[in-house]
Each structure stands twice: as C-alpha cells, then as structure tokens.
C-alpha cells in the first residue's frame, strides 16, 4: 500500500491520499467568525437542490489533498489575526473525506490549540454523526474531538434566508461540539 507521511509519521494511503479538494480560501470571512482559512473538500452525496457549490459534489473534482496541502493550510493559520479553520465542501463527513481530513485536524490542533475549527455538514449531528457514524467508524469520533463548532443539516432551498448567521437555511443548527458531546445532546451556539 502507498504510504502517506503526516507530521513525521508514516500512515496508510487510506488515511488521506485518496481525497480531493475543490478550493482553499485564505482570509475568508464568510464561513465562521473572524478571518479564517476555509477548505472546500470534494465529494458529496447529499446533492441538495440549490447548493452553492454543486461542482464539489464529484469526489474526483479538484486537486489531490496531500501533506503539502496540509502544510500550506497550517502556514496560513500562523498569523495571529487568523481565527481558525473551516471545513466545508462538498461534504467533510463523507467517510473518504473523514479519513483525508483527520491528519489536518490533528496537526491543526497540535500546532494551534487556540484556533477554533468549524465544520459544515449536511448530516445531522445527533442522528447521523453521533447516532450512526460514530458507531461504525472510529475516525468519526476522533474527527469530532478536534471540531469546535458544527453547522449541521442539509441546505433546504425552501428555508433559505440571507439573514442567517453562517448558514444557508433555517433548518441548519450551529452546534458547540465539545459541549454537546459532554452533555450527550446538541448544545447550540446560536
């Protein structure tokens, strides 16, 4: 099997080599509080009508996600004015993307524990992620351990509102992940 070097540790290829990303936005102010680096992963099976990033549904779209990509993202997080990292897509919680994102999350929290990590997902935190994925895949539990805020729920065009803070439709929730895991139910940021 091909090897993938992350943070000086050899890891199997399935831990990250097989993920693509659509775009990286540096100095982004639209996808979480403050100035951030936002990574748009490729691959999504939700196919929400009215999706703002339909091109990223295809898992093969974009560029390969590599340790060099991780290094560029980490370098972008160094300035003090950068508040954190945002993951969106595509769908970060697709299984293949979870495996690809885990080394980035590990290295981000290790180097920048003061920076917050936001993630946008079409899956529901309690029903899909904690209720099913965590039971099937250890990578999901570990991924959640690094995420501070999760915006969950599919985009629903009929519930779209431009007045919502960091979400596209009113069914979506902004969840404090660590507090929710400790409590055993979703704790909303707003």
Placement of each model-derived feature along the sequence:
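Flexible, glycine-rich phosphate/dinucleotide-binding loops
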Residues: 30, 126, 183
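Gly/Ser/Thr-rich beta-alpha loop segments that engage phosphate groups in nucleotides
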Residues: 45, 91-92, 124, 155, ...
């Amino acid at each position: 099997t091909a090897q993938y070097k992350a943070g000086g540790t050899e890891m199997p290829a399935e831990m990250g080599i097989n993920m693509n990303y659509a775009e990286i936005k540096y100095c982004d102010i639209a996808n979480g509080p403050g100035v951030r680096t936002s990574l748009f992963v490729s691959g999504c099976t939700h196919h929400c009508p009215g999706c703002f990033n339909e091109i990223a549904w295809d898992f093969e779209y974009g560029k390969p996600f590599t340790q060099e990509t991780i290094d560029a993202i980490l370098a972008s997080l160094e300035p003090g004015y950068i508040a954190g990292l945002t993951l969106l897509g595509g769908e970060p919680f697709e299984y293949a993307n979870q495996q690809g994102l885990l080394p980035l999350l590990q290295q981000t929290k290790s180097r920048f524990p003061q920076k917050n990590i936001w993630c946008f997902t079409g899956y529901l935190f309690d029903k899909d992620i904690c209720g099913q994925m965590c039971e099937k895949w250890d990578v999901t539990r570990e991924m959640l351990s690094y995420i501070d805020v999760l915006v969950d729920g599919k985009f629903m065009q009929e519930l779209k509102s431009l007045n919502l803070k960091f979400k596209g439709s009113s069914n979506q929730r902004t969840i404090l992940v660590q507090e929710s895991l400790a409590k055993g139910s979703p704790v909303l940021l707003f």
